[in-house]
Amino acid sequence: MKNIVVVGAGFAGLWSAVGAARKLDELGVGADEVGITVVNRDSWHAIRVRNYEADLDAVRVPLADVLDPIGVGRVEGEAGAIDLVEKRLAVETANGPVVLPYDGLVLAAGSQLHRPDIPGLRQHAFSIDTHGEAALLEAHIQKLGTTPQGPGARTVLIIGAGLTGIEAACEMPARLAAAGVGDGRGILA
């Protein structure tokens, strides 16, 4: 049996796995001939471009809902060493290490936000790069309406004017108002 292993379940990884499954189905190749496995840190597909939203429930899709019906396997864990000669991928799971043999390997692990070493950035800045970080921002926004504030404390500076930054800037006034921060303002930089 041949094995295709996809590392990462973001858009690139998920579409790679789904596309491979669809193509194999079109060719009449059964799961007993070629297996597809997705390796991901958790059991969710995160729609990162929507992490600016206040309601984060809809920005994560259970991988089981997408992959199980089409016969794609899942391994939850951290991908590690790749043995290019033996064609094996080491994965650290909650139950210990696992080695996955592969005939085809797709590396779609995604990106990670680079946080420069700027004094005060880690203490006073929030990110929406991950679901967890977006949840921390939402918790902070909810506290703003009830916490005594000093000058400038109700100002939100959004750094980055790409799609996500613009979406965050457009949504921020409504989020601040919903949290009781009627005089809050957002600045897009």
Where are these regions (language model features)?
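Beta1-alpha1 glycine-rich phosphate/pyrophosphate-binding loop at the start
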Residues: 1-76, 157, 163-189
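FAD-binding core/adjacent interface of flavoenzyme oxidoreductases
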Residues: 72-155
